Amino acid sequence: MSSYENHQALDGLTLGKSTDYRDNYDASLLQGVPRSLNRDPLGLTADNLPFHGADIWTLYELSWLNSQGLPQVAVGHVELDYTSVNLIESKSFKLYLNSFNQTRFDTWETVRQTLERDLRACAQGNVSVRLHRLDELEGQPVAHFHGACIDDQDISIDNYQFTTDYLQHAVSGEKQVEETLVSHLLKSNCLITHQPDWGSIQIQYRGRKIDREKLLRYLVSFRHHNEFHEQCVERIFNDILRFCQPETLSVYARYTRRGGLDINPWRSNTDFVPATGRLARQ
């Protein structure tokens, strides 16, 4: 259980509650969650963040009417900057997108600008939005995370409660290495509903070599942990930086979609450019 799971800032969320589905545009449906909820317990404040990054959203169920009433469909790509005051709560995002369904817009650009304006207002930070026609995406191959997969280790695990203990003394040797490690076994639970969130994670670092067994045990310990996707990625980044002390570090997770949305947060303290192709489970 997260230390802020019952925080009053979460009381007003529609997540976990019965809601009506509106199909006429309503920006008030969007709800933000303060990033400070998970950053404060980690000792992180807006002026001392050890990373940069973004939350990348893919919008698969986006539709509206053109000026003549003909339905339009698109796939949306949203990048929400890490410095925003709030992250966007995903159920509210879904409800907000549903409100476009029976709303007329003159142009695709009007839709893009509307999304960008409303998301910026909710997040209180920088947001960029791109809309793709379906034929732009046809034939794109399923992507994969580059790196060494650490999942096929012959180890026994019987503890699935979150702990940072596995990262203590998880580095060895004085030689600096540079490697990229990948796991598809990341599973956490929604902060409010406790529904499972499934993801793949890529960890790039330069520093003393990290013990792969200990790293995998640490990642598996998220299995009963309740936090939003973005919060888990920041926690993982902060924990590895704290206990393993790499010179450079990048953490990037791509989660399976829910409600027509997938969330793909990344955090880094170096020059990192995330690949945005969807993975096999997305």
Swiss-Prot record:
Listed transmembrane segments: none
InterPro entries: GTP-CH-I_C/QueF, NADPH_dep_7-cyano-7-deazaG_red, QueF, QueF_N, QueF_type2
Enzyme class per UniProt: oxidoreductase
Domain of life, source organism: Bacteria
Main location as per UniProt: cytoplasm
Pathway in which this enzyme or protein is active: tRNA modification; tRNA-queuosine biosynthesis
GO molecular function, one term: preQ1 synthase activity
Residues the entry annotates as binding NADPH: S90, K91, R258, G259
GO biological process: queuosine biosynthetic process; tRNA modification
Keywords linked to the UniProt accession: Cytoplasm, NADP, Oxidoreductase, Queuosine biosynthesis
Catalysed reactions, as listed in the record: 7-aminomethyl-7-carbaguanine + 2 NADP(+) = 7-cyano-7-deazaguanine + 2 NADPH + 3 H(+)
Catalytic residues, chain numbering: C190 (thioimide intermediate), D197 (proton donor)
Compartments it resides in: Cytoplasm
Cellular compartments per GO CC: cytoplasm
Matching HAMAP family: QueF_type2 (MF_00817)
Sequence similarity: Belongs to the GTP cyclohydrolase I family. QueF type 2 subfamily.
Function text: Catalyzes the NADPH-dependent reduction of 7-cyano-7-deazaguanine (preQ0) to 7-aminomethyl-7-deazaguanine (preQ1).
Quaternary structure note: Homodimer.
The protein's name in its UniProt record: NADPH-dependent 7-cyano-7-deazaguanine reductase
Natural source organism: Salmonella newport (strain SL254)
Taxonomic classification: Bacteria, Pseudomonadati, Pseudomonadota, Gammaproteobacteria, Enterobacterales
Gene for this chain: queF
